């Protein structure tokens, strides 16, 4: 019983946060839709508003759809890297193998450390 109450409270809080995120920008709306379709059991657990007119691209025609109608099933989910404003992670780091000491610490007595380890 307490778990059901907790879950309802969590869904309300998540709904508030996703609504706020979706109202901030077009990419925020895309992220909200991705989170709700990926991690929630039912499509209608969290209601995400459509983007405002200023967030829509100029060529996009306004959609006339009642709020209660469920969207059509999506054949596959959109990857996060294709959401506007989310950039692909690059794995270039400032570290290279030559700059990392053999045992993870810099020491003048590396052979003595090797014997101890």
Curated annotation (Swiss-Prot):
| Example of a GO cellular component annotation carried by this entry | membrane
So which cofactors does this thing need? Answer: Zn(2+); Mg(2+); Mn(2+)
Q: How is it modified after translation?
A: Proteolytically cleaved by CASP3.
UniProt cross-references to InterPro entries, sorted A to Z:
PDE4_UCR
What's this chain's function?
Hydrolyzes the second messenger 3',5'-cyclic AMP (cAMP), which is a key regulator of many important physiological processes.
Its assembly, as annotated, is: Interacts with LYN (via SH3 domain). Interacts with ARRB2.
User: What is the name listed in the Swiss-Prot or TrEMBL entry for this protein?
Assistant: 3',5'-cyclic-AMP phosphodiesterase 4A
- Originating organism: Cavia porcellus (Guinea pig)
Gene from which the chain derives: PDE4A
